[in-house]
């Protein structure tokens, strides 16, 4: 039968593995942080597609605005010319 104390002591191999794990974690912690920051920046950054869509939408609105006023003014000019012909 084993003693109660024997459960608390760890094998030297396990202690060594734990030490290596701690050192490895300390080394990779800045790398993990940098990777997380990169992923977050990529996730929140506005992409080229979004910028292109916004520019296309603005251009379409300006074109519609211009077409509306062009057609509205051109019909007024045509009606004025018809009145002058009489």
Curated annotation (Swiss-Prot):
Membrane topology recorded in Swiss-Prot or TrEMBL: Single-pass membrane protein
Keyword annotations from UniProtKB, A to Z: Endoplasmic reticulum, Membrane, Transmembrane, Transmembrane helix
InterPro entries: TRIQK
Presence of keyword Flavoprotein: no
Endoplasmic reticulum listed as a keyword: yes
Pfam family, one: TRIQK
Biological function: May play a role in cell growth and maintenance of cell morphology.
The name this protein goes by in its record: Triple QxxK/R motif-containing protein
Source organism per UniProt: Mus musculus (Mouse)
